[in-house]
Amino acid sequence: MTDKSTIDYFTEEGSVEAVNARMGADTDPRLATVMTSLIKHLHAFAKDVELTQEEWGLAIDFFTRTGYMCDEYRQEFILLSDVVGLSMLVDAINSRRPAGATENTVMGPFHVEGAPEYDMGANITLQGNGETCTFSGTVRDTKGNPIEGAKIDVWSDSEDGYYDVQQPDMQPLYNNRGVFRTGADGHYSFKGQKPVSYPIPDDGPVGQLLGHLGRHPNRPAHMHYIVSAPGYQTVVTHTFVDGDDYLTSDAVFGVKASLISPFEETPDGDTKYHAPFDFVLTAEKGQ
């Protein structure tokens, strides 16, 4: 006969302890730390809102549909993380930098590996009728020294607010994308289109969630950058168009004051706008 008094039964009050006690002694220490905290806060959430069976079923269905929306070009889980602010929080925790260094923001779900590498001054717009713009500036370290050989990976939406991978039958792959490398002076320059504001994909479960919360899905106009160099922390960031209507209500909380860039009209230039922006990279720890 089983001695029932020796069993550690699952109870509402002792749920956290019951689950965490099952963790094996050989569990990876970091995994143990993460899962112990996750169980603690997940159970606390369920107790705090007194989650119903119906609500839990809806949540499971939501996550299932979110998974079905993912493919090689679209990551609905990234969108979910973005709209609840988790992407920005994780990024903030992992990219603390000294004052004056360029700040990170969310990468977004539409970065594509393998974009063509161009000479400085090239135009990354393969097809489009948007407002033309020259993007330029320097890449320096925190002491003001130019960084030679910095890789600048850039991408943006079309004049209609869509990335190339969202319209494979309408835009050529790598439209409004390119890679550049700085010379000894740390300078960069390329041409493209002035970005426009756009809604994140809202035809899936994440868009439905925003609707239920009374939130719009729009992002302010921005150019994406990944700036990297040997010995320096990689910067994943945007430059935002100053004056955009959605700067104060970005659907993914990505706007930072230091990343808002002037887009200056250039009546005598070869493009309609000029968007100057300088990047400051922080040395890797130990460098």
Q: Where in the sequence are the language-model features?
A:
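Beta-strand-dominated extracellular/periplasmic modules and repeats
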Residues: 2-287
